Amino acid sequence: MESSRILITSALPYANGPLHFGHITGAYLPADVYARFQRLQGKEVLYICGSDEYGIAITLNAELAGMGYQEYVDMYHKLHKDTFKKLGISVDFFSRTTNAYHPAIVQDFYRNLQERGLVENQVTEQLYSEEEGKFLADRYVVGTCPKCGFDRARGDECQQCGADYEARDLKEPRSKLTGAALSLRDTEHAYLHLERMKEDLLAFVQGIYLRPHMRNFVTDYIEHLRPRAVTRDLSWGIPVPDLENKVFYVWFDAPIGYISGTMDWAASIGDPEAWKKFWLDDTVTYAQFIGKDNTSFHAVIFPAMEIGQSLPYKKVDALVTSEFLLLEGFQFSKSDGNFIDMDAFLETYSLDKLRYVLAAIAPETSDSEFSFQEFKTRCNSELVGKYGNFVNRVLAFAVKNGCTELSSPQLEQKDLDFISKSQKLAKDAAEHYAQYSLRKACSTIMELAALGNGYFNDEAPWKLAKEGNWNRVRAILFCACYCQKLLALISYPIMPETALKILEMIAPYSLDLGSQDPDRLHSLWTDSFFDYSEEKFSLKEPELLFTMVE
């Protein structure tokens, strides 16, 4: 049985560049849709996200940009927070891994793993720059590929032949920043022995939700576990307590940011202990939303880190992965010019158009593609032609004919059948949301709009109006508005602005939105919402929901 308390997290966006449509549809829109749905169900939802602010890519790019590390991550933290707001992502708290609570809990995780014999130190050879007086991580190194001889190969892989290797395997290694020659020196690092938790991890993944095509990947990954270094020779990061001049690898500290971010949230609401009711209570339902490239860290490595703790931290119940979203057949890449400026896009097209199309093409089980042609087709055919047309024509007809106050009339069997079919589709939508399928939810939304359009066409109230059969006209309008009420409900998680407009225009007697936060509608998806017997509608002049995309 699902808990009344729901914890939701989505992969922390890396503070190293702007978010693109692929990021949004892969982790943040699905998490937002699920959060909105669960709030409608009356659940106590906490959706936590935040910036991932450590790691080699940040230090390297900050240095190349001539910026301080904190200055650099501050810039992208603000950008990501603003992007979430513009996209209507209803995150309850957007934290960051430079928050005040993060260092202590990361170091505590490390000590607990040490005490259980799961972290051990090992001396290895790493590349050292005499000129810079420090060890250099792979991203700071270039050299000659040991496989193909390409003389500008990166420190972790060759962009010429695709080979991957350790930076120390490069021939003639040199500093990417200064060009200085590098030498090998011994250095001590801590390693997490994941292979010692293999049986625990296999048992764990059998009990959680994974998309079927990901389960084999995760199981195979666990079967081939090996020790992983948890420390790096860097100055920017969380210091390692017992190793001088070392910080934790970003993959180790970042997922702990979900917990420290919740601590940050608890402090912000004036209840520092509130984080515990989500992270130290196993009756909580925890859903995590990520892109497929983060699967191993969230399905295996972070749960392994939690297994090794003295506190019973909540482990994920549902790990919801997405494949990649391509742009016109290619990966999103600002440097290659295959990129859409999100601000410019939203200045031209409404937010709900974008949210709907991204949800409808969500890469849930395979890579999918965003193209402007499909965006245009879906907006014009589905949002304007089906959805908006149904709402507008019903309300325009009602207002024109003075039928703006509607109450439960005498209904015929065909009306009851229509209401029953509408309710069935709304319940189907609930099932799709509960199973993390935005694509199926979008299909059901359009199916309900088409059902309403078909009913209105078949009953042809304009003909009945000419005959003076106003009781029947009002009955048809009542049923159509009831369908629109359900349409607004099932649309809200994906198209919140549009759903609210519909509810404002039909003004159901049973619904008082005045006391609710419109961005966090709560406890509406109830049996009473579906009851039509005592319902009334007070209709307003229709507002165009969607315009054509040229």
UniProtKB/Swiss-Prot annotation:
Its cofactor is Zn(2+). Zn(2+) binds at residues 145, 148, 158, 161. One of its GO terms (biological process) is methionyl-tRNA aminoacylation. Transmembrane segments: none annotated. One of its GO terms (molecular function) is ATP binding. Keywords: Aminoacyl-tRNA synthetase, ATP-binding, Cytoplasm, Ligase, Metal-binding, Nucleotide-binding, Protein biosynthesis, Zinc. Binds 1 zinc ion per subunit. InterPro entries: Anticodon_Met, Met-tRNA_ligase_1, Met-tRNA_synth, Methionyl/Leucyl_tRNA_Synth, MetRS_core, MetRS_Zn, Rossmann-like_a/b/a_fold, tRNAsynth_Ia_anticodon-bd. The keyword Isomerase does not apply. A motif ('HIGH' region) lies at residues 13-23. GO terms for cellular component: cytosol. Its EC number is 6.1.1.10. Its main location: cytoplasm. SUPFAM superfamilies: Anticodon-binding domain of a subclass of class I aminoacyl-tRNA synthetases (SSF47323), Methionyl-tRNA synthetase (MetRS), Zn-domain (SSF57770), Nucleotidylyl transferase (SSF52374). Monomer. Is required not only for elongation of protein synthesis but also for the initiation of all mRNA translation through initiator tRNA(fMet) aminoacylation. This is Methionine--tRNA ligase.
